[in-house]
Amino acid sequence: MTTIHATAIVDSQAQLDSSVTVGPYSLIGPNVKVGAGTTIGPHCVIEGHTTIGRDNRIFQFSSLGAIPQDKKYAGEPCELVIGDRNTIREFCTFNIGSPGDLGVTRVGDDNWLMAYVHLAHDCVVGNKTIFANNSQLAGHVHVGDWAILGGFTVVHQFVKIGAHSMTALCTVLLADLPPFVMCQGQPAQARSMNYEGLRRRGFSPERIAVVKAMHKALYRESLTLQLARERIADLVKNSPESLPDVEMMLLFLEQTSPQRGIVR
């Protein structure tokens, strides 16, 4: 049976699995769905068309599913969708999507989101990411799998953050951050590649060598972006094992907005 504290207010139309726990003084709206094993701490507000998967842990004072901070929003039925096994720490704020995009803010699985993280409307977060305290995403930001955002990182709207990338403390990200790249600064500048993270995730020395070569092509040879892409594409010839990594980088660079560009 669902465990709901006597002081919590859960709308009768909300759909909570029988194993969900809701802490004191939390408010759950009518269009909320919560999967098995999820724990909702005290003083949380979950509203809007919000779907939360299995085995998530939501800490006190989090606000999930509020309307977007967008003056154009006029009450359209947009959504927040959160996957499984996420940790959402104190005072996090995740807004629903907006009709100006796909109408969905989405969080994947196995993410670690520390206190005061903000996900604005239409953000898309992959799997196994880490957001340190007070990381702030403006609208329409996309974050790839395994990315790590340092504390107080702020991200401009529409920016894309590639898989396995990393930002340092207090980074201001105004341009797209390619996969594997570590950056720092206000505004951000590329510093290196996330080699230690790749080793911890089981990347072979051969794959890491190709990542180093991609870094050299992008940042050490003064090449145009087009020439760097051609150089990166050639790396597969000597390392078929690295094909997924090279393809991911090339696709990211191809999809980068000319107006936004990449971190240099």
UniProtKB/Swiss-Prot annotation:
Q: What class of enzyme is it?
A: transferase
- Catalytic reactions of this protein: a (3R)-hydroxyacyl-[ACP] + UDP-N-acetyl-alpha-D-glucosamine = a UDP-3-O-[(3R)-3-hydroxyacyl]-N-acetyl-alpha-D-glucosamine + holo-[ACP]
> Where's it mainly located?
cytoplasm
Instruction: Identify the EC number(s).
Output: 2.3.1.129
Q: Which GO terms describe its cellular component?
A: cytoplasm; membrane
Location in or out of the cell? Cytoplasm
**Which keywords appear in this protein's UniProt record, sorted alphabetically?**
Acyltransferase, Cytoplasm, Lipid A biosynthesis, Lipid biosynthesis, Lipid metabolism, Repeat, Transferase
Output the Gene Ontology terms for molecular function. Answer: acyl-[acyl-carrier-protein]-UDP-N-acetylglucosamine O-acyltransferase activity
Pathway stated in the Swiss-Prot or TrEMBL entry: Glycolipid biosynthesis; lipid IV(A) biosynthesis; lipid IV(A) from (3R)-3-hydroxytetradecanoyl-[acyl-carrier-protein] and UDP-N-acetyl-alpha-D-glucosamine: step 1/6
Subunit: Homotrimer.
Q: What does this protein do?
A: Involved in the biosynthesis of lipid A, a phosphorylated glycolipid that anchors the lipopolysaccharide to the outer membrane of the cell.
NCBIfam families per the UniProt record, alphabetical = lipid_A_lpxA, PRK05289.1
What is this protein identified as?
Answer: Acyl-[acyl-carrier-protein]--UDP-N-acetylglucosamine O-acyltransferase
The protein's organism comes out as Albidiferax ferrireducens (strain ATCC BAA-621 / DSM 15236 / T118) (Rhodoferax ferrireducens)
Source taxonomy: Bacteria, Pseudomonadati, Pseudomonadota, Betaproteobacteria, Burkholderiales
